[in-house]
Amino acid sequence: GSEIDLSAYATVGGVKSVYQWYLIDRATGKRTKATMQAVSGKDGAFIFEGKPGEYYKCEITNNNYRDWCMETPRIKVARGSADYSPADIAGLKKLAADNPNITQLKEFVDSKGWERENWNSYQDNIRTDWSTGEVGRLTHLYIWFEWNSTDTNSQLDLSAFTELRHFECENHMNISKLDVSKNTKLEHLHIYSKNLSSIDLSKCPELRYFRFGTNRTLEGRYQDTKLAALNLTGCSKLTELYLEHSPLASLDISSFKLLSRLEIEYCPNLKLQGFDKVTSLTYLALPHTEQFADLVKNLPASIRQLYLQDTEYELPSSQVGKNLESLGLPGYVESLDLAQYPNLSNLNADGSLLRYSTVKNYRQI
């Protein structure tokens, strides 16, 4: 219902400007043409309408200047304090009550931090995002603590968040169980806890991203965990899988036809089944592992990024090497012929014995 006044740009050089509104998809950034009611008798002024939580922007062009274009910032339809799902609010309050030693959670609840809808604010340690519509449902939840924090998350009840699509809580987790059976719309899960012995994701058919461990390859040794059972049955949409610091013994990935990124680190007991059935894989990282020598010898030609730091694996065949764009070298490598890697644009030699003087057919990459 607010008036958006852009009338200052209604005429440029005697030529009327054209205003085009767009609805912005928050996840993809895709724009869809939209219409705003014009204010009568005031060119370039509009009555702003939309569903709570939606984002819009207006593009202004003028034929007097062919390449001239202006855009407003993204404009968000505000939501009232009463327009959030009571069930989701109760779930956030329970999360804080279950972990009374986590001051940041308590402060978030006491201040009604969800009203900030601060998903894109990377300065905040607790961030949320909500669905569009008259009653907002919690779709994204991120909990992060400073590296030197003494807080630990000991209980994690996500059952109230039935519309949750993205959950992330990596550090200072001390949970021993995780129940996501009610989170059937979950697409992105990043979690880590040394006491978590099993994870069942079979009720999450929309899952596309799962990470158990740290955010970055070679970020450093966390404590080894108890994760010995992982059920990914039915997660056929999975595209990214990251596992580390786990005693997990076996994992069948044959049903993940869409899997494009796989990272395994510090999992000494893990054996993979069905690797040859994963035909979409382009990214493979196996640092700090010893058991995948046969796998590395038989990599698919689809691999574009390969990271083998702190391993003793053989370098890939020329058939695979010619397609590589990024390569992390095993520690023993003393020399490298770049002629075998014509498409390589990134080379990580940290921790290896490679020197500039031992690189053959050197070129700028």
Show the residue positions of the predicted features:
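Intrinsically disordered, low-complexity proline-rich tandem-repeat tracts
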Residues: 180, 186, 207, 227, ...
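Per-repeat beta-strand-to-loop junction in leucine-rich repeat
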Residues: 144, 168-171, 181, 190-193, ...
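Canonical position 11/12 of the leucine-rich repeat
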Residues: 148-154, 172-176, 195-197, 216-229, ...
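N-terminal capping/linker segments that flank leucine-rich repeat
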Residues: 1-166, 184, 203-205, 236, ...
